[in-house]
Amino acid sequence: MASGQEKRSELDARAKQGETVVPGGTGGKSLEAQEHLAEGRSKGGHTRKEQLGTEGYQEIGTKGGETRREQMGKEGYEQMGRMGGLATKDKSGAERAEEEGIDIDQSKFRTKS
């Protein structure tokens, strides 16, 4: 069994190759950088929630979803939701849709201009 240090070294090597190894650490070029990014993003969300209160924070999330639906159009938003619903921990929604023969029109994901 790998020790904690060996595991961290392996994760650090994967992070340096561009893989996200820490949830919320997207963009970090090392394991430590990804950990710091994830922590900062989490704290930012908690701080905003404290400022707005739970109801206000939920309202902002709802408005964001509505805005995105308006930008993409109803069909594109539904297609994106369908693909998100197919996603699993191991496979993206696109991979699962392809495997299961489900037709998802990704051209509708574009923002309307």
UniProtKB/Swiss-Prot annotation:
Pfam families: LEA_5
PROSITE patterns tied to this protein: SMALL_HYDR_PLANT_SEED
Biased composition (Basic and acidic residues): 1-17, 32-52, 65-77
Tissue: Expressed in embryogenic cells, somatic embryos and seeds at the later stages of development. Not detected in leaves.
Induction section of the entry: Up-regulated by abscisic acid.
InterPro entries from the UniProt entry: LEA_5, Sm_Hydphi_plant_seed_CS, Small_hydrophilic_seed_prot
Region described as Disordered: 1-113
One of the record's GO cellular component terms: cytosol
Membership in a protein family: Belongs to the small hydrophilic plant seed protein family.
UniProt name for this protein: Carrot ABA-induced in somatic embryos 3
Organism: Daucus carota
Gene: CAISE3
